[in-house]
Amino acid sequence: MAPGRAPTTAWIGFDTALGLCALAWGDGGLTGSQLPEVDSSNSEALRRHMADRFPGVPQCLNPAEAPAEIQALSVAVAAQLGGELVDLPTVRLDMHGVPPFEARVYAETLRLGPGQTMTYGELAYRLGEPSAARAVGQALGHNPFAPVVPCHRVVGAGGKMVGFSAPGGVQMKQRMLDLETRAVGGQGDLF
């Protein structure tokens, strides 16, 4: 458990078109999520990764036993990563222990809809911190809630695909953006 975080109760793994993902929760809501591993079919890799992030927290093997909001979120994330145009359901994010600046970055990032992008600098400007583009990038690099907090929609200056610390790196970021662009009626590559 991260310092200052509320306890995580359990996590579920679920399949998507891009590979296995996971959602973790506790009494405070969603405590974390995991985008597909590089070896997207490797359930053991997912279990190891979740065990590293949430030591001692059990995997919920029956998704029907997860809270209703987590069940709905897993279905929506799978649909989104399968190329469907869906708005993810609103879930409580456990922000205990999240530094205030990072919480502000996540709140502003949540305003970006499918197919929309913004640069790190534009996001910093929206936060009233126009010289904080690098700090915005670092905050998004710490994002424990991807893709619920859609950090993949924040890009480098000029639309460059930079700064994606999730498994698969910038290639995964580009795949996710391409799926969303097609879903909203675009042709793929955003830039």
Regions found by a protein language model. Name each.
Residues 1-130, 179-191:
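Basic nucleic-acid-binding alpha-helical/helix-turn surface characteristic of O6-alkylguanine DNA
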Residues 157-191:
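…primarily DNA-binding HTH/wHTH and HhH modules…
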Residues 147-154:
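Short Lys/Arg-enriched helix C-cap and helix-to-coil transition segments
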Residues 132-146:
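Regulatory, non-catalytic segments
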Residues 113-116, 144-147, 159:
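Histidine- and aromatic-rich ligand-binding microenvironments
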